[in-house]
């Protein structure tokens, strides 16, 4: 058993959560490393990182440790040497429990100022050296200025270790107390807490006078790197994350989950006030505000608990003009300033009973554990979420329209009501929207839908006001994820003259919008809704790069809309693309443009593409992207051209094998054969099946051949079922 005995009661808990033992470096000259082989310090926490790690008065002093097994105060055969690290803790390897380590006062001496036990106490047990922890990957970092105080496994055992086994490296599961899993504790813990224990919680805290790690006090004395922590007085409780013993410091009692509206602290009477003031006693990393991220609820001691967030100035956003409220959407009242409301709780006194007055601004918004700003809410919005049975109208939310617009369910409520609202109700809601920054609302994830509804259901005056807000910002809105939707809706519902004014702001930014994941939708909507004569600046920008944009993930969409809607310019666009058809057919995005030409192009355009397909039928049919074009070609060509494809597949060979057999076994070309079966007349289909059916046994061996077999069987069943019907008609 390994027992930690803290030699410095004032040593602070400064070990970080998931780092090794990074002691502050010190010059070699300032350290006395003599006699390290006799008594070596353990890797326990030192003083605070912000303070000096070494004390000059302690470095130069001599320390006396007794030999022998006598546990009384007699000092026999003392060995004196200089300890360079007086704040470290020594380990005992004799297997005794902490209770057997009795501390007794030491008589004053001349060099008492260097005693590593300032309280006048020292251990009576002999302290053999720690051995061979150097190779342990968990404990392997030491100051560069210090000699590594560990014996290698290959080294011979010194005389001071003659009484120990030759291989004394302890298992990781036995280090630093009683750990019951392979995860172990990465960091030794002094476990000497300045706090008084919580009532009935001796399994978690220790006495202020004795550092203990035995099973009597800590069945598992650390939760670092462990999923389960077993309190002595309760059944095992599941913890989703890791923390350590002292992480009960900033937990506040609340009852949010149960919906209760009161805050009643229920701490035990012995709860020390210093516990609430302490930031973290654990080895887990802390947030910037000092709170530990691993504070967890413990139902065995506390009915409901939550982390107290830190009050922080409001973030810079359009919500600055909105009412300030607390963490969970309830504004604090100003009528009773002395009332203290714990963050994350809902006092009954602030809940409205019958009125829906606007929220009164209170303290700045709170910051949650992830550093995100809490959405500021009003009383009405809270009741809207809390009371699902109440029937709300637009008149009930007046004064809170912007807040509702930026809320998911509130925005949906406004959208539904605006579709059937009266003109007066729409105007009242619109006045609140227009009085704020509409641009910010247009770029909001939920607010943009409310603005869109006013382009759809609003009157001309309201549309003009919104257009005045958009003017000068069309390009920036077009590149924004939610703002581009508002611009599209505006183009769709405003008058033609306003459409031209709006889209003219994109002159000089056409290619920027075309190649943007959001802006390309605005260009598409403009091509769909605005006359081609007013879009010449767009077509001029597209024409020199039209074959390049056709292979662009966003540009290909714009080219398809141009081919579909720009009738006067369609011929010029296709003529620019025809020399690049074969390359575009094999492109991941360009193949969609070629398919669009087959669907909307002239017969001469289709004929040109078909001739290219028939010349490279096998290659294109086995291509991942080009096979889509071949399938589309089969659907849109004439029966005569389709017969040409069938004859080529049946008659020609490649690599001493029929093209049909190669295509049936290919993972892409087999879909071309299936498409040919679907699109061909019955006579040609039966001919194709007659060539496929003899190879059914071979196709069963291929994964993709099985799909074709299913199609063949389906058509054969149709043919068989059709024969009796013809026979019955002949008999009649």
From Swiss-Prot:
- UniProt entry tagged with the keyword RNA-binding: yes
Locations listed in the record = Mitochondrion outer membrane; Cytoplasm
Fetch the InterPro entries from UniProt: ARM-like, ARM-type_fold, PUM-HD, Pumilio_RNA-bd, Pumilio_RNA-bd_rpt
Polar residues composition-biased segments: 100-109
Domain of life according to the entry: Eukaryota
Please report the residue spans annotated as repeat (Pumilio): 396-431, 432-468, 469-504, 505-540, 541-576, 577-611, 612-647, 655-690
Q: Which CDD domains match?
A: Pumilio
Which residue range or ranges hold the PUM-HD domain?
376-716
Keyword Membrane attached: yes
A GO BP entry is:
nuclear-transcribed mRNA catabolic process, deadenylation-dependent decay
User: Which residue stretches belong to region Disordered?
Assistant: 98-123
User: Which keywords does this Swiss-Prot/TrEMBL entry list?
Assistant: Cytoplasm, Membrane, Mitochondrion, Mitochondrion outer membrane, Repeat, RNA-binding
Under Gene3D superfamilies, the record lists: Leucine-rich Repeat Variant
Induction info reads:
By stress.
UniProt GO cellular component terms: cytoplasm; cytoplasmic stress granule; cytosol; mitochondrial outer membrane; P-body
Topology with regard to the membrane? Peripheral membrane protein
Which Gene Ontology molecular function entries are recorded, alphabetically?
Answer: CCR4-NOT complex binding; exoribonuclease activator activity; mRNA 3'-UTR binding
Identify the main location. mitochondrion
* Other notes: Present with 846 molecules/cell in log phase SD medium.
Q: Which family does it belong to?
A: Belongs to the PUF3 family.
Q: Report the function annotation for this chain.
A: RNA-binding protein involved in post-transcriptional regulation. Predominantly binds to mRNAs encoding mitochondrial proteins and localizes them to the vicinity of mitochondria for translation. Regulates mitochondrial biogenesis, motility and morphology.
Check the record and name the PANTHER family matching this protein. Answer: MATERNAL PROTEIN PUMILIO, RNA BINDING PROTEIN PUMILIO-RELATED
Name of the protein in question? mRNA-binding protein puf3
- Organism whose genome encodes this protein: Schizosaccharomyces pombe (strain 972 / ATCC 24843)
Query: Taxonomically, what lineage is the organism?
Result: Eukaryota, Fungi, Dikarya, Ascomycota, Taphrinomycotina
Name the gene for this chain: puf3
